[in-house]
């Protein structure tokens, strides 16, 4: 089950309309609609936490392990990092879709990918020309 399905299920159990949930979470009704349609994913962990609280569930349940990794990437590196990690997660999930990989093994693979992404990003900093480096990146 993915985020959009879990969100619909829990919202139905809580007897909340999209508008009421949006008001509680501090987002627009259209945002909740996009989440449920799967055309948008929440990257801000604070929004996911408000939704989870309103639905009496956890962020871990709503997002699943891969969603948490993407949300953490957004917190750590912004929207581009979140998109990169989300793309990696989608590709890896697709590779394992036909096989019999346990949930724990898939979660381990996602964690390893996340770690590898951040290590590569850190090592790549030394190849960035000085004129493009931020003040905090210079050594």
Where are these regions (language model features)?
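Helix-turn-helix-like N-terminal two-helix hairpins of bacterial/phage DNA-binding regulators
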Residues: 1-72
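Interfacial/linker helices and their anchor residues that mediate assembly or domain coupling
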Residues: 68-139
């Amino acid at each position: 089950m993915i985020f959009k399905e879990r969100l619909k299920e829990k919202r139905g159990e809580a007897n909340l309309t999209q508008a009421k949930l949006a008001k509680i979470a501090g987002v627009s009704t259209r945002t909740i609609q996009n989440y449920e349609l799967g055309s948008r994913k929440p990257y801000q962990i604070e929004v996911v936490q408000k939704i989870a609280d309103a639905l009496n569930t956890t962020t871990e349940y709503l997002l699943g392990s891969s969603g948490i990794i993407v949300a953490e990437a957004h917190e750590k590196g912004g929207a581009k990092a979140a998109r990169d990690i989300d793309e990696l997660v989608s590709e890896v999930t697709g590779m394992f879709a036909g096989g019999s990989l346990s949930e724990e093994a898939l979660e381990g693979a996602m964690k390893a990918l996340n770690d590898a992404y951040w290590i590569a990003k850190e090592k790549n900093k030394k190849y960035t020309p000085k004129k493009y480096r931020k003040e905090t990146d210079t050594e």
